[in-house]
Amino acid sequence: DEEKVNFANALVGETKNISDITISVSIRLGGMVVFAGDEAGLKWLTEKLPKDDRFPLRLMHHAAFHSPLLQHIVPMARAQNPVTDFGPGSIPAIDGQGKIWSPHAFSADAIYAYTLGAQLTETYDFSRAVQVAAAEFAPDVVIVLGPGTTLGAPTAQALIASGWRGLSGKADFQARQQDEPILISMGMDEQRAWAER
């Protein structure tokens, strides 16, 4: 939803002029935005964000992931995980910027720099990763492994936003799920059975 993206970016921009708070977009998660921030920034956000049912919601143990607030972690992570721990890969991987890392087609230094750099300190665009996977690999069905069921809705929202397989909205997606599912969440017993057919 472009309106939400613009609103989130405007909030982050507004904080650039406030010296005692820090916020940034942590994760683009389907139709939701997850923010990262220091304590003062998160309090400020709670006051600024519109109230909607259960939102804004503060995630347990999530404050600074995928944000500049973790910049100090990068040297520690690299000290504990040398580049020699990174191999050529065996299946394609898509990162939080939507880049595909094809097996044997990238340097260990490059994936190391992303994994223990930008992945820690920059926005993780889950929506973009899902959209790139759907567009580039053209799956018959998208299977969400987990954890639990929390990624099903954001995955569906990302697919709808990109018009994957002609999806035009929530009602269209729900109707297609009834006839021949295109998204399976392994965290749901009844959907897990669809994947086992």
Task: List each model region and its residues.
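Short, solvent-exposed amphipathic alpha-helical segments in soluble enzyme
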Residues: 50-51, 110, 158-161
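Acyltransferase
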Residues: 54-145, 150, 180-185, 191-196
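Short beta-strand
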Residues: 22-28, 58
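Short amphipathic alpha-helix segments
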Residues: 1-19
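Short acidic, glycine/proline-enriched helix-loop-strand junctions
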Residues: 151-190
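Helix N-cap motif at beta-to-alpha junctions
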Residues: 37-44
